[in-house]
Amino acid sequence: MQEFKQHTGLAVPLDSANVDTDQIIPKQFLQRVSKLGFGQNLFHDWRFLDEAGTQPNPEFVLNFPRYKGASILLARENFGNGSSREHAPWALADYGLKAVIAPSFADIFYGNSLNNGLLVVRLKDDEVDALFKLVEANEGQNITVDLEAKEVRAADYCFKFEIDDFRRYCIMNGLDNIGLTLQHADAIDAYEAKQPVWL
């Protein structure tokens, strides 16, 4: 997992509420065991006009030339609802997205995203509205997500957000559950060495 302290990138506005995990990454693409390769099928049923994924939908926002290379996704309320699948944050990250900003997220998706190094930021409705208007009105508009300061900045806007201190520490230091455990490897080994040997 990569460290995340601050990121500035092009933002793409997905103006849909209640986007579920099957829309993020449809179930027919969940056969992989690696985290890589899911990005090509992100929002498959919206991004493509055909099942094979060879005909891009020119009316879907991620296909607009002005948003090519976007690394921050703006979304609406209840993003990531539906069935629990870690493949959803994997697909978003593999596509190149570093953060998702929305008024609210489904709880399981929120946890899965942070556990996998995808920063999900909750802002107030009016703050998200302001960012949507800014990005839609200004081609090439970047947004900065500053995890150290717990701020989202763009143009003259500066919005504060909250995140659990433990999750913030893990993401800033690039630690997933395994990495966090390995930080305590010496203490674990010392504890194990003190245990009686059973035959």
Swiss-Prot record:
Highest taxon above the source species: Bacteria
HAMAP family referenced in this protein's UniProt entry, alphabetically: LeuD_type1 (MF_01031)
EC number: 4.2.1.33
Function: Catalyzes the isomerization between 2-isopropylmalate and 3-isopropylmalate, via the formation of 2-isopropylmaleate.
Coiled coil start-end: none
Gene Ontology molecular functions: 3-isopropylmalate dehydratase activity
Taxonomic path: Bacteria, Pseudomonadati, Pseudomonadota, Gammaproteobacteria, Aeromonadales
Pfam families found in the cross-reference section: Aconitase_C
EC class (word): lyase
Keywords (A to Z) from UniProt: Amino-acid biosynthesis, Branched-chain amino acid biosynthesis, Leucine biosynthesis, Lyase
SUPFAM superfamilies from the UniProt entry: LeuD/IlvD-like
Catalyzed reactions: (2R,3S)-3-isopropylmalate = (2S)-2-isopropylmalate
Membership in a protein family: Belongs to the LeuD family. LeuD type 1 subfamily.
NCBIfam families listed in its UniProt record: leuD, PRK01641.1
GO BP annotations listed: L-leucine biosynthetic process
Gene Ontology cellular component terms for the protein in this record: 3-isopropylmalate dehydratase complex
Name of the protein in its database record: 3-isopropylmalate dehydratase small subunit
Subunit structure: Heterodimer of LeuC and LeuD.
Annotated pathway: Amino-acid biosynthesis; L-leucine biosynthesis; L-leucine from 3-methyl-2-oxobutanoate: step 2/4
